Swiss-Prot record:
Keyword Metal-binding (UniProt): yes
GO molecular function, one term: metal ion binding
Name of the protein in its database record: Superoxide dismutase 1 copper chaperone
Alphabetically ordered keywords of this record: Chaperone, Copper, Cytoplasm, Disulfide bond, Metal-binding
Cofactor dependence: Cu(2+)
GO biological process: copper ion transport; removal of superoxide radicals
Cofactor note: Binds 2 copper ions per subunit.
SUPFAM superfamilies: Cu,Zn superoxide dismutase-like (SSF49329), HMA, heavy metal-associated domain (SSF55008)
PROSITE patterns xrefs: HMA_2 (PS50846)
Species annotation: Debaryomyces hansenii (strain ATCC 36239 / CBS 767 / BCRC 21394 / JCM 1990 / NBRC 0083 / IGC 2968) (Yeast)
Gene3D superfamilies given in the database record: 3.30.70.100, Superoxide dismutase, copper/zinc binding domain
Length: 250
């Protein structure tokens, strides 16, 4: 059984009706032990064992967007954006996201979502190196194998809500698929930072078309209350709009 952890989301809300809608969406999820909705700060906090991607999807079903602002205790979370290095995907390379949260000593959960891939079983693994100079081929030996991921849900508007990447509009309907898995690893967050995650169609092997990305530390719950980026001067929602244009959906 997955241990409980805290997640903080930024959600644009204007009135009590917005709060009620978000509250109803959270009540429908099994595994959330408690939640708090702060209208003034536009923040939603949950505690439980539900994958972050599923909570994002539930909130977005109300018509509101949701951005994860922090997960777990300080220094207990990481993130990895999975990209394709295949030339045919150059216009939209982002295909997946792994959110990693420590729920105990040597106990991690990995919320892995992918979108816009051929149907089939894929094999994610953590690699020893974070060198992406040759895509997945330069990430080194396997550091830790994760469980297989079934990619079998046809791409649709609902899959792009809580995933990264999107099917090209020129692709025939039904030819690309999405998948989501809640995986476990007997590791610590400190073991992972700077390494990489790959997603391969081949078990125990890396292929040129394998997705890959570097694992980076991410904010714990309440460690990121930024509303405006000090570098760009843009709000989180302006940055969100730019990310959406590049295929980033959550």
């Amino acid at each position: 059984m997955t241990k409980s952890f805290e997640i903080v989301f930024a959600v644009p809300m204007e009135c009590q009706s917005c709060v009620d809608s978000v509250s109803s969406s959270l009540k429908s999820l099994n595994g959330i032990s408690k939640y708090d909705i702060d209208l003034k700060s536009n923040l939603v906090t949950t505690e439980g064992s539900v994958p972050p991607s599923e909570i994002v999807k539930a909130i977005q079903s109300t018509g509101k967007d949701a951005i994860i602002r922090g997960t777990g205790a300080p220094n207990s979370a990481a993130v990895c954006i999975l990209e394709s290095f295949d030339p045919k995907d150059i216009q939209q390379p982002v295909k997946g996201l792994a959110r990693i949260v420590s729920v105990g000593a040597n106990d991690l959960v990995v919320d892995l979502t992918v979108n816009g891939l051929p149907q089939g079983v894929y094999y994610p693994s953590i690699r020893k190196s974070g060198n992406l100079s040759k895509g997945a081929l330069s990430t080194g030996e396997c550091f830790y194998p994760l469980g297989p991921l079934e990619v079998d849900q046809p791409v649709s508007e609902s899959t792009t809500i809580n995933s990264l990447g999107a099917a090209s509009p020129t692709v025939e309907e039904g030819s690309l698929y999405a998948g989501q898995g809640f995986l476990h690893a007997d590791l610590n967050i400190s073991d992972l930072i700077g390494r990489s995650v790959i997603l391969s169609k081949l078990k125990d092997k890396t292929a040129p078309d394998s997705l890959c990305g570097v694992i980076a530390r991410s904010a714990g719950a309440w460690e990121n209350d930024k509303q405006v980026c000090s570098c760009s001067g843009k709000t989180v929602w302006q940055e969100r709009s730019e990310a959406l244009a590049k295929g980033l959906k959550s």
